[in-house]
Amino acid sequence: MNWMKKRWAVLVASVVTNICIGTGFAWSVYQTGLFNESVSVFGTEVSQAQLALAFTICSGVAPIPMIAGSGLQKTLRGPRNVVWLGGILFSAGLIATIFIHSLSMLYVAYGLLAGFGIAFAYGITIGNTVKFFPDKSGLIAGISTAAYGAGSIIFPPIMQALISRYGVMPTFRILGIAYGVVIIISAWFITAPPEGWLPDGFTPKTGGKAAAGPGQADKNWKQMLADVRFYLMILVFIIFATGGLMVVSQGSPMSQAIGGADAATAAVIVSVIAVGNTGG
């Protein structure tokens, strides 16, 4: 097999997968639809805050499968099967949402099922793809991550158009099936490089300081946890991520409540917000 060509197929498949699962950032479009149809869906009115908790759970569980995903590659015999698992869970979470009658069911369907699916797929598409491109690791990680953000640029207007025409629950079903099919097909092209494989003409840096950077040394995970700088870094990440996720996940109801936008315009605003998220 020509692995120099294969790696580009892996990159494209990973980008397509991340675009699909990245629509999780467009939750606010679903949330607005659920809020408007809350009486028919839940049998009573619910608040925006109660609905927003589904996205909070979806994002909050993400670290668990991301950490477990690397170990699952051995259990499931490769990254392709982990992405398949992620795609099936993500699709199942969206489709299961059409059967909900309570907020707790929403939290399980979208928050847990879809959340675990997103994280399983995302953790593999980034880490595995970078293995194919040690010569361009920063660029490739950026492209793969940007694709995750791009999902919430492309799909919000489509989501809102479907909600306006069919309602929010059929939209969950339509998109759940569509995403599942696309991810399963894309995952077929995702594989891991052979052990020790390197691109033609690439020679990796060797030695502790050369690999880690001038004046620095590599740390194992135990040493990392013992370093106070690790916790400061985590705190900075949490602060920045919290602000960003608040805006990204509530773009639609915020623009309607504060700016007086209609649902279609609010969906476009969500896409515009996602442009900044993707660019970053």
What name fits each language-model region?
Residues I19, G93, S104-F120, I238:
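Hydrophobic core of transmembrane alpha-helices in multi-pass small-molecule transporters
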Residues W27-L34, I140, N220-G280:
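Extracytoplasmic gate region of multi-pass secondary transporters
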Residues F42-F55, Y107, A141, A261-V270:
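Juxtamembrane helix-start elements in MFS-like secondary transporters
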Residues I64-S104:
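Conserved MFS/SLC helix-loop-helix module at the cytosolic interface between two early adjacent transmembrane helices
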Residues A147-E195:
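Helix-loop-helix hairpin linking two adjacent transmembrane segments in secondary transporters
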Residues L34, G111, I118-F133, S137-A141, ...:
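Intracellular juxtamembrane helix-capping segments at the cytosolic ends
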Residues V39, R77, F99-H101, P134, ...:
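Helix-breaking motifs and short loop linkers at transmembrane-helix boundaries and internal kinks
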Residues L53-L72, S271-G280:
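Central cavity-lining transmembrane alpha-helices of secondary-active solute carriers
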